[in-house]
Amino acid sequence: AQSRFLAGYLGPLVRKVLVGPYREWTPVSPEQKKYWHPRYRAESLTALTRLVSWNHEINLAKLKIPVLILYTPFDDVVEVSSIIKKFNELGSKKKSLLSIPSKNHVLAGAITSPETTELVTQEMLKWIQGLNSKE
């Protein structure tokens, strides 16, 4: 909901009031602190929310390329119902929506989701190999 305010005409002003000059978060591990950027300029939030808003205007029925969407039903960053809705709008004949049992928005990687990295890798490889089939 906040993102709608940030994407609008008054987005920069709203951002300054709600966030200030920087967006900061606390890393959950020393590795995350080492390899991620937990502090960045808040202007990027306005740009990101405008990009997301623009994406909502795209006619996905016209999209005919193969699409694989991986998501977690536990996502606290993206609304899962929106992921499913957008997937159903895709005009692609070869499309797959795959739920990954990760507790994190980032579905794979040694730092945030080591328990699902192998699963994500295998599912992606299987999907890519399936592109050659004549379904």
Go through the PLM ranges and name each one.
Residues 52-55, 67, 128-132:
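Sec/Tat-exported extracytoplasmic proteins
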